[in-house]
């Protein structure tokens, strides 16, 4: 099962059913991290709203995955026959990051550090897996909405890095992530 990924394995095609629960758990942990940031920056209204929006968007990803789960429950053959590309090391890396960052966020963290953590998490390729899983739904509108929301989130992240930090390297990472995701998701849509 994907939960206990072997880091030596290469990206592979795996069934939607096998990866769905893992994706749900990682999205929940990502949402929880952003909620920690919401609390950490509650005194700065614009930052609080931004982090709450990021958490809310992770919740919408969970809703999309629940829709995938509903499709699979109503047509189990789809869950067994539909496959997505999956790299087991993505799960191991992201789970480790989320655990470490969750502990770190319990303490006082800087705005720069929160943005750095978010860029690391958003760079994990999990969102690509979520978009791939949405192919099971067979509604282009649902996939398009997920892609637009992801690009919007990353663009907002880049904007906030620029507005609240003077860290050019961090801004360059955020901008590169937006461009990478835009290119990757635009190709995947066609």
Regions found by a protein language model. Name each.
Residues 2-190:
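Non-heme di-metal
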């Amino acid at each position: 099962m994907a939960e206990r990924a072997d880091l030596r394995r290469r990206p592979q095609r795996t069934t939607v059913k096998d990866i769905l629960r893992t994706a749900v758990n990682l999205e929940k942990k990502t949402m929880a991290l952003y909620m920690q940031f919401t609390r950490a920056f509650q005194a700065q209204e614009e930052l609080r709203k931004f982090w709450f929006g990021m958490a809310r968007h992770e919740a919408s990803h969970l809703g999309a995955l629940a829709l995938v789960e509903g499709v699979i429950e109503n047509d189990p053959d789809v869950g067994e026959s539909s496959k997505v590309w999956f790299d087991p090391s993505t799960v191991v890396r992201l789970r480790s990051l989320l655990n470490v960052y969750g502990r770190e966020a319990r303490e006082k963290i800087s705005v720069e550090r929160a943005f750095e953590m978010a860029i690391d998490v958003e760079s994990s390729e999990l969102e690509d897996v979520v978009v791939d899983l949405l192919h099971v739904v067979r509604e282009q509108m649902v996939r398009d909405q997920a892609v637009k929301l992801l690009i919007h989130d990353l663009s907002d992240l880049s904007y906030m890095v620029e507005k609240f930090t003077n860290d050019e390297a961090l801004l360059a990472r955020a901008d590169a992530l937006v461009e990478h995701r835009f290119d990757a998701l635009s190709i995947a849509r066609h």
